[in-house]
Amino acid sequence: MGDLSCWTKVPGFTLTGELQYLKQVDDILRYGVRKRDRTGIGTLSLFGMQARYNLRNEFPLLTTKRVFWRAVVEELLWFIRGSTDSKELAAKDIHIWDIYGSSKFLNRNGFHKRHTGDLGPIYGFQWRHFGAEYKDCQSNYLQQGIDQLQTVIDTIKTNPESRRMIISSWNPKDIPLMVLPPCHTLCQFYVANGELSCQVYQRSGDMGLGVPFNIAGYALLTYIVAHVTGLKTGDLIHTMGDAHIYLNHIDALKVQLARSPKPFPCLKIIRNVTDINDFKWDDFQLDGYNPHPPLKMEMAL
């Protein structure tokens, strides 16, 4: 993990930057509790972990392995659109949700009448239409339910001191209709000194595959919301409940731990976008991303 003395310390946090993630992985490997899980693979698990990532002059896209940046962007824009159709991502050559929208997975989980690609009322639906009755991924839900994302944006603009700027993906009524319950369940925004910060609570964190993606995804959401509200970016605080390593990811993560992190890249939004619904892939410029090679880890199903 390199020389820790070269990293700036933050009050309450021993390490900063990517070393926080690497330390979490190392702690789970050393002290994690062996647990069974729904996939049958098994995990090493610790409960309650937190890291703080500085978003002011850098973007927390891990460098000790290559993270699929375009997928991070396209998935977030898909959430923002309120979409729950995995075929929309597949059409952009993003296949991270394909297996969950497959007829085999849907049938195995009791969704026999679902069209292929229909994931149920997952993240995007909850962000934009919380409380609306979910029919299918093709229905028009315009002005149905609560648009939590737009409500947060409006509140940041009109009442930035508010402590109620929250987006929740955890809707107990809708969970039986989802292909998977949300792993990252809630985020809260905070404005101070002209900066926007975000804290995300993740009930379940797959350290090998999901967590690097989730860190980048919520960092990007913070950049986007800051852009449309005229603020600078502050911090991303990433809090996890069950932080775990699948047993079949251990070898790859040991390779990752042996690598020294490189400087995080910088992110620029290169077009003046005022409506959060108008962002597209070409609006984001990532500079200085020079990661170590990718590491293959199988998705646990």
Curated annotation (Swiss-Prot):
Give the record's GO biological process terms: dTMP biosynthetic process; dTTP biosynthetic process; methylation
UniProt superkingdom: Viruses
SUPFAM superfamilies linked to this entry: Thymidylate synthase/dCMP hydroxymethylase (SSF55831)
Positions contributing to (6R)-5,10-methylene-5,6,7,8-tetrahydrofolate binding: 206, 300
Record-annotated residues binding dUMP? 38, 163-164, 203-206, 214, 244-246
Q: Which Pfam families match?
A: Thymidylat_synt
Could you say which enzyme class this protein belongs to?
transferase
Q: In which pathway does it act?
A: Pyrimidine metabolism; dTTP biosynthesis
Q: Which residues form the active site?
A: 183 (nucleophile)
**Which EC numbers characterise this protein's activity in its record?**
2.1.1.45
Going by the UniProt record, its keywords in alphabetical order are:
Methyltransferase, Nucleotide biosynthesis, Transferase
Q: Which reaction does it catalyse?
A: dUMP + (6R)-5,10-methylene-5,6,7,8-tetrahydrofolate = 7,8-dihydrofolate + dTMP
The GO terms describing molecular function are: thymidylate synthase activity
Record keywords: Transferase included? yes
The record's note on quaternary structure and interaction partners says: Homodimer.
What the record says about family reads: Belongs to the thymidylate synthase family.
Q: What does this protein do?
A: Catalyzes the reductive methylation of deoxyuridylate to thymidylate.
Q: Which HAMAP family match?
A: Thymidy_synth_bact
Task: Kindly provide the name given to this protein in its UniProt entry.
Answer: Thymidylate synthase
